[in-house]
């Protein structure tokens, strides 16, 4: 896959908000925060959006930047700043932790939005609809790398019709489908819904290995789903893990030399 021409990206940070209190990241968290941090530094327009009670909202730019930088420091670099958890908690309480749901109405493109079903109209907050309208002639992408909240068909319809967005998902695995005995009851059905939505709505799927790619293709064929373009985006190793490995090797080497020296003394 060649470089994409991206004028604007709508990156889904719902999982990052939901996982804000986790002291350490899971594998999916690591991918999610890396992509979010990467987009934060890019020159093109980016909006960080989240899902709450089946509705998509847009995070204020400063809030999104603070969320991503705090989690990146906490999970990746371990440079945890003072009051990190308190700040993350405050962001959470003002977003998906907020019990009040105030969905605003869109101001533009009434000719399109007036044709939405009640479910589609509720799926995207009016202020986000206005952003989709404003940038609809740009090369826009909705990106979700976390599995979190995937399957929101009404919202995807709005994204594609109002915003003319292309949709990209990252599929990490289909373990809950292949091995339901190893997951919580119901997780296999939930993941089937997610993967089906990826097949039906995505313009491109990112996977972490050729095996995941092959299993996704098989899943699509078995269920008579379309097979969208699939691209392997291999996952690297965190610098901190490499550093720890090198330190461990050095320590073993030093201990071995010390042991040899002691034995020679005897």
Protein language model features and the residues they cover:
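Carbohydrate transferase catalytic cores enriched for Leloir-type hexosyltransferases
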Residues: 1-266
